[in-house]
Amino acid sequence: MFSYNRLLFLIDHLIWGILVLVFVFFIFQSEYFLTERNISNILTAAAVLGVLVAGQTFVLISGNFDLSTESTLGLAALVGIWLIVPAGPTTFGGGIYMNPYLSIICSLSMGALIGYIIGCLITYGNMHNFIVTLAALLVIRGLMMAFTEGAPVSGFNNPSADVFYWLGHEKAFKVPGLGKISVAVLATGLVYIVCHLILKHHKFGRELYAIGGNRDAAEALGINVNRRIRQVYMLSGLLAALGGWMLAGRVVSIQSNLGETFIFTVFAGAVIGGVSLQGGRGTMLGALGG
């Protein structure tokens, strides 16, 4: 007998069957599709979006959504590079000469801080998540434009910026049939493993499903809903900052429009992967496929 739970599992992960069909289609369409170099490039290009989709999945499962992801990505990367690159006429930097690894911590913290502020406005200010995150998207993008004066950020050739280049370009090892696997792909895989464990085997994940499924019932069960919402936006901001680190290192440039229009692809990836816009449903495995 086909149980209801098994049917839901198949529906949530239907994307993987579709991916197999698309994969087979392109194999017959082009002799170059299955080359190691092409597969490696596809995986590397998808790594940034994969991290953003993971963060958005947490938010969607809780019954909320985050439109500020793409702007958070850009500002966090901008802050990280500004802290380590010397100030000068040909470089963009604050002249702080911060330790590169410490600058990465600051960059990730910036993402988490933005998420926390958004969460506080939603919970303490009793404001709708659409209004707050849309405003954050526009305000942060404006700050980036003012900070950079609309010019591309240079300075990636500085040795201190190698930590950005490492995550965006460095190849970890070679896998037969898949080519050289980049550090970004490995980082994305690790993110999904950790996020899957949190959703399925941790109290935090179970409470998110409860909040997204029925907020009133979750509150009646004693779940601190507002605190979880703040935490979920912090997590989304943190993962957006990680995505910014990856993207900046891959394109070796930061512009005021870094990550622009990503939000549409991120939402599409999560929803196609079986994550409900109504909340309370979705898996990391499905989101990864999306």
Where do the protein language model's features map onto the residues?
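Transmembrane helix-bundle core of multi-pass membrane transporters
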Residues: 4, 101, 130-201, 228-231, ...
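Single transmembrane alpha-helix segments in multi-pass membrane proteins
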Residues: 24-92, 113, 120-127, 267, ...
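Hydrophobic core segments of alpha-helical transmembrane domains in multi-pass membrane transport
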Residues: 15-28, 56, 81, 111, ...
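Alpha-helical transmembrane segments within multi-pass membrane transporters and channels
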Residues: 89-137, 289-290
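Helix-loop-helix "hairpin" substructures at the membrane interface of multi-pass membrane proteins
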Residues: 99-107, 114-118, 122, 176-254, ...
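Membrane-interfacial amphipathic/re-entrant helices at transmembrane-helix boundaries
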Residues: 1-53, 88-102, 174-177, 223, ...
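Hydrophobic alpha-helical transmembrane segments
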Residues: 12-17, 42, 71-75, 101-109, ...
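Transmembrane alpha-helical segments in multi-pass inner-membrane proteins
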Residues: 234, 240, 250-290
